[in-house]
Amino acid sequence: CRGEGEIVHNDAKRGDIGNTSAMYARTFLTNMDCDAVTVAPYMGEDSVKPFVMEGKWVILLALTSNYGSSDFQNFPGNESAFDERHPEHDQLYKYVLKRSQKWGDHGNMMYVVGATRAEMLKEIRTIVPDHFLLVPGVGAQGGSLEEVVKYGMNKDVGLLINASRSILYASSGKDFADRAAREALSLQQQMGKFIS
């Protein structure tokens, strides 16, 4: 059950062949009635399209905040990697941002861009100026909330900033609910300060 105005995001990070993706999409977005689901787009359009539904959000992994993301996401393109259909031979995450915009629009597709890569948000905003960005990595992973807002905000704010561990592990004692609430409120107040 959810309160009015609350959004349910299933951070499933799915991505499979078309038929299997269709089953995942139906399960998460229809049967479970989630509002959004995170999808790994690296199997291509047919793995993402089943998640593109009216009134729902597909959130594509683009540039994640984890250490190993540079193994693939920052891979520099070259002629052998990306053919003539993409002459600028971008890094993989940029190619994902550009290519995937053909599969949905800013009303049903957003992107995961880690706060630990805040300096890259300025360029990312030139590629996806109107899309929401889900930004994990503020808090325990060391991402700067101030830099995320500075470089990632668009005319409509356009940011969903996530800080999981700093809230989930605020305390292991009986005061967990109070400490987690204080941590969440503190983050919200910091966001308000940077946005206004």
Where are the regions that the model predicts?
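C-terminal helical cap(s) of enzyme catalytic domains, especially alpha/beta-barrels
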Residues: 147-158, 169-196
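A C-terminal functional module that forms or caps the active site or interfaces directly
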Residues: 115-162, 166
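Alpha-helix-loop-beta-strand connector modules within alpha/beta enzyme cores
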Residues: 1-9
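Conserved anion-binding
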Residues: 12, 16-112, 130
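Generic structural signal for well-ordered alpha-helices
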Residues: 25, 48, 97, 121, ...
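Generic structural signal for well-ordered, non-membrane alpha-helical segments
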Residues: 21, 44, 89, 93, ...
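Short acidic/glycine-rich loop or secondary-structure boundary segments that cap or lie
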Residues: 46-48, 67-72, 119-123, 142-144, ...
